[in-house]
Structures are given as C-alpha cells and as structure tokens.
Regions:
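Bacterial Sec-dependent N-terminal signal peptides
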Residues: 1-22
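Noncatalytic scaffold domains of N-terminal-nucleophile
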Residues: 21-51, 63-64, 68-208
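Surface-exposed charged/polar residues within alpha-helices that form helix-capping/stabilizing sites
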Residues: 54-55
C-alpha cells in the first residue's frame, strides 16, 4: 500500500502547486491578483519609486509629474538598468484633448564621433563598454519637455524625493545587488565609475 499512498501524495502536491498559481485563470503564470484604484496608480520596478509616484499624485501632481519623480528615483536605485544619462521614450494620452502624444528623447551620437573616426581607428563595430557606445543623454531633456506640456508641480518638488534618497540612502534590493555585483569586474576597469558605484571596489552591504 505504501506505493499507492506515495502516488496520492504526489498528486495532492501537484494539485496544490497548480491551485496556488492560479488567479481565476487556467494559466500557471498568472500569479498576481489585479490591482484596482479609484483615483490613479503607479507601477515601477522598485517599491520606493512606486510610492514616490503615488505621493506625487496625492499632492495633486499629474501622471507626468509622478512619472518623472519615479524615473528620477529609478535612476538612483537601479543603476544597472536605468539612469539620467540614458534615453527616454514616452507615450502620453491626454484625456482632455483625446489625443495621443509620443516623445522620442533618445540621445544622438556625439557630433565628432563620425563614421570616418571609426574607420581611421580600425573599429568595425561599436564596443559594448567604454565611452564610445555612450550617446548624448536625452532623459533629462525629455523630463522637461514632458513637464512643459503636461506637468503641474514645480520640478524642484518633483525631484526632491530622489534628492532625499540620494543624500540619506536607500535599501538595496537583492535583484539589483545581484546585477550590480556581476558588473563590478567591468566597471573596475574605469576608476571614476568604480569610485561612484562601489565602496573601495566592492558592492555595498545588503541590510535587511
């Protein structure tokens, strides 16, 4: 009888696993319930950035005000995938005019970084690391373009949460710590970046 009991236990475990994943669907990947809000919501990859966006909305800021505040925080809290020195793309729906707006704030190549330069240096493809793959930052200019058209609160107030976290610190999440540590061998090749993103060449300690 023992093999039968064991088989039943396996069936129960599999059933429990399947049921725990479902959210009124038959899809095993649907593991989160829907979120419902009456006045607005924000979604980012970091809980603190999300809370900052919600706080901006509560203060009477627009969705763009909240998005800029959250984006500024992400540039600080997730340096492995976000930053003020990068690009910005936005799609904005204006409920008043019933119009859809798009913004391409991607950075251009530096003026003197021409095709002839690469040919003269014998560079056949843009390297993944170093100064050559870096474009002129478009993110901050994109913030002000969006704010000029859809913003309401002063930019100083919008950026203040990110400034406060930069001065006072913030908890480092496990996922960001993982990718941050993976990149240390690469950024250690550049002294100025090492000084900015490490503590004596090492990852900041995780504190929980």
């Amino acid at each position: 009888m023992k093999p039968i009991y064991f088989f039943i236990i396996l069936l129960l475990l599999q059933f429990t696993k399947t049921m725990s994943q479902n959210r009124l669907t038959s899809n095993p990947f649907a593991t989160r319930s829907e979120v419902i809000a009456q006045n607005g919501m924000a979604a980012t990859s970091h809980p603190l950035a999300t809370q900052v966006a919600i706080d901006i909305l509560k203060k009477g800021g627009t969705a763009i005000d909240a998005a800029i505040a959250a984006n500024a925080c992400l540039g600080l809290m997730e340096p492995t995938g976000c930053g003020m020195g990068g690009d910005l793309f936005a799609i904005v729906w204006d409920a008043k005019t019933q119009k859809l707006h798009g913004l391409n704030a991607s950075g251009r190549s530096p003026k003197s970084l021409t095709l002839d330069y690469f040919k003269e240096k014998g560079i056949e493809k843009i390297p993944a690391l170093g100064p050559l793959p870096v474009s002129v930052p478009g993110c901050v200019d994109g913030w002000f373009e969006l704010h000029g058209k859809f913003g309401k609160m002063p930019m100083k107030e919008i950026l203040q949460p990110a400034i406060d976290y930069a001065r006072n610190g913030f908890p480092l999440t496990e996922l960001i710590a993982y990718y941050w540590e993976r990149n240390i061998p690469y950024i250690s090749q550049y002294p100025n970046i090492t000084e900015t993103f490490t503590i004596e060449g090492k990852l900041p300690n995780l504190i929980f």
